[in-house]
Amino acid sequence: MRGFFVTGTDTEVGKTVISSGLAALLKEHNRDVGVYKPFLSGISRHHPDSDTSLLKDMSQTSLSHEDITPFAFKAPLAPYVAGKLEGKTVTMEEVLSHWGRIREKHECFIVEGAGGISVPLGEDYLVSHVIKALQLPMIIVARPHLGTINHTFLTVKYAESMGLPIAGIIINGISDSPDEDEKTNPEMIERLCGVPILGVTPKLANVTKETVLHMVKDHINLSLLMNQMGV
């Protein structure tokens, strides 16, 4: 299976915007792409503003909202915690079983995690365990601001300790008038982590299909991305 697992150094770093943009970019280059975001918290998967809806719209997949996101919870918390509040526990086997049912429906997949790679998804597993099981290279979405060097370095080193392949890092959310830290962080992160920067993307005032696709086309290194995916 070709594709990527998109994770982040934190929550609210723009994983879904990047994931959906990558899916649209691959689609525009004639790739048969599907999307999978197994967990969603705090919003209905069918809501037009949900991560699931954006992923579905941008990828143009025929997969249903339930196919894309089989496990959804009401509380805006880590999936394991949100599930416990509802008396629900999702096992690793359930996540992988659902993946097995949809993975053959597309040539490649963009899979999006929940928060960072250490977020608990169930009683005895984290996002990192799902990444390892799916065997997809990671794309790490990181903030551009002060503090991101440490967060990104720790994410990379933990991933390496788990034997997880890392395709690259995307620095997301650069402001219109970047401070000195925003200007220098990408180069420092690439040097310290030894992982390629796939792109440095701006903060979007409005998230639409058009603005997201325009952003990734202008700011993501497509040739490097394709090379990391082996196409």
Curated annotation (Swiss-Prot):
Its EC number is 6.3.3.3. Its main location: cytoplasm. Mg(2+) binds at residues 16, 51, 112. Its cofactor is Mg(2+). It is found in: Cytoplasm. GO terms for biological process: biotin biosynthetic process. Keywords: ATP-binding, Biotin biosynthesis, Cytoplasm, Ligase, Magnesium, Metal-binding, Nucleotide-binding. ATP binds at residues 12-17, 51, 112-115, 202-204. GO terms for molecular function: ATP binding; dethiobiotin synthase activity; magnesium ion binding. Substrate binds at residue 41. The active site is at residue 37. Pfam families: AAA_26. Pathway: Cofactor biosynthesis; biotin biosynthesis; biotin from 7,8-diaminononanoate: step 1/2. Signal peptide: none annotated. It catalyses: (7R,8S)-7,8-diammoniononanoate + CO2 + ATP = (4R,5S)-dethiobiotin + ADP + phosphate + 3 H(+). The keyword Phosphoprotein does not apply. One of its GO terms (cellular component) is cytosol. NCBIfam families: bioD. Catalyzes a mechanistically unusual reaction, the ATP-dependent insertion of CO2 between the N7 and N8 nitrogen atoms of 7,8-diaminopelargonic acid (DAPA, also called 7,8-diammoniononanoate) to form a ureido ring. HAMAP family: BioD. Belongs to the dethiobiotin synthetase family. Homodimer. PANTHER family: ATP-DEPENDENT DETHIOBIOTIN SYNTHETASE BIOD 2, DETHIOBIOTIN SYNTHETASE. This is ATP-dependent dethiobiotin synthetase BioD.
